[in-house]
UniProtKB/Swiss-Prot annotation:
Protein S19 forms a complex with S13 that binds strongly to the 16S ribosomal RNA. The keyword S-adenosyl-L-methionine does not apply. This is Small ribosomal subunit protein uS19. GO terms for cellular component: cytoplasm; small ribosomal subunit. NCBIfam families: rpsS_bact.
Amino acid sequence: MARSIKKGPFVDLHLLSKVEAAREANDKRPIKTWSRRSTVLPDFIGLTIAVHNGKQHVPVYVTENMVGHKLGEFSHTRTFKGHSGDRKAAGRK
């Protein structure tokens, strides 16, 4: 179920204050955050936000298409190693 429109998008206040400070100072350094639950706002466009994936901070350059999504969607937490191949088919070739 989607979030109520009357509540508005959720953004952690510490992240919002860091974004506003970076905008005022015209700072292009990545903003480090652990807040995967925050919604991407139009103010974030053009900034690089380093989102924590549980192990490291993954730099995410925010574009116009990302507005309305959560930051955690762009920083994957699991590594897919691939399915094991068919052992019989590999031996025949």
